[in-house]
């Protein structure tokens, strides 16, 4: 994996790119950090879409929280 400092820098750059109005497709296992910078997302479980919606809706979805936030 990447060092925490490098991950932090990558997310910072992704936010800056998106702030310019450029759409970013991000595939990432760190759901909490990814949803914090996302507008909309898809959550996969065993290769299938288990949920989709706004970042806020996904972060409050009980199934997503159970699977990805412990």
Predicted regions and their residues:
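ABC-family nucleotide-binding domains
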Residues: 3
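H-loop/switch region of ABC-family ATPase nucleotide-binding domains
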Residues: 28-29
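A short, surface-exposed alpha-helical micro-motif characterized by mixed small hydrophobic
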Residues: 34-36
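Short, glycine/charged-rich "phosphate-handling" switch motifs in NTP-dependent
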Residues: 40, 52
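Short acidic-hydrophobic catalytic motif
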Residues: 56-59
């Amino acid at each position: 994996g990447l060092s925490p400092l490098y991950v932090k820098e990558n997310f910072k750059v992704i936010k800056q790119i998106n702030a310019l109005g450029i759409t970013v497709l991000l595939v990432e296992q760190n759901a909490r950090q990814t949803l914090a910078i996302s507008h909309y997302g898809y959550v996969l479980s065993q290769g299938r879409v288990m949920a989709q919606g706004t970042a806020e809706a996904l972060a409050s979805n009980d199934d997503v929280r159970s699977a990805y936030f412990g």
